[in-house]
Structure formats: C-alpha cells, structure tokens
Amino acid sequence: INAMAMLAVCDSLGHDTAIAAKRLASFTNLPGRGAFSSGKFDGTAITLIDDSYNAGPASMKAAFASLTVNPPQIMVLSEMLELGDGSAAAHTALAPGILSLRPRVVITIGTEMSRMAAALPCSAVHEPAADAEAATDRLRAHLRDGDTVFIKGSNGSGAWRVAATLIDA
C-alpha cells in the first residue's frame, strides 16, 4: 500500500512514475522490519521473518494478518513496551491472532507476553524465556528443516538479538 501511495504522489507531482517504480523495485526492508531471509541455523534450513524492531498492538495484529497465507511454525514474541496500565489487556488481545496462525511453538520473552501465551488454548508448545539468549536456546530445541520462524517485538525488549543470532549463523 505504501508503494502504491508513493507512486500516486509521484504521478500527482508530475514525476516519472516509471523511474520511481524502478527505484522502488530495488528497495529492501530495513533490518527488523519484516525482512525475509532463508538459510541454515545449526544445520537446519529455515526461513526467517524478522520483524523485531517495533511492536505495538496495531503492528502486532497487522503482522499476524499478513502471515495467514503462509503461517510460521515457530513464533518468537517479545513484549510490547510502554503501554502503561493497558499492557496486560493489550497483550491478552493478541491471543486470537496467534491462535489463527496455529503455530507449532510459541516462544515468549517477558512477563506480559509469557502470561498471555500460557493461557492460549491451543496445541502449540509454549516456551517462556527471560531474555533473548534463553529464547534462542529454546528455539534451537524446536527447529525442524523447512520451518518458518517469525520474530516480533519491541526493539527495547531484545527480540532483535534472536534474529541477529539466526542471521549471523
């Protein structure tokens, strides 16, 4: 949608949309903002969806909605920060989106996210982790060849460290 809007603005300003489209075609996602990558981690072939830079209620729900066609087998979710008194309710409200994706494993980082996932009435294995290092260890134990791993969380919660470990492997 953003790309289409950008092309419409270029057109309305009288710029060459063909040039804009060519430049847009070479655009790559910034680290932690939904980039897809494939490779091996500890000898296991995986696809990583790294959305570890930002997490709020709306961006979490939008991310879950974008995953419905090819849902991940493993989700690594860290807390949404700076939500104040509404934090518990905002985390609990994520449950339907997670349930709809039917992940095999949900690894959570942080108290609020772990509390939410522990209450999920689904067949997914829930692995709570105190920090990114523990989450990476739990991830190692569950990876299977061909898995898609989705990582989402607030930058300050450290989910990006899990993604960095996978990318650098």
Model-derived segments and spans:
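ATP-dependent carboxylate-amine ligase
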Residues: 4-169
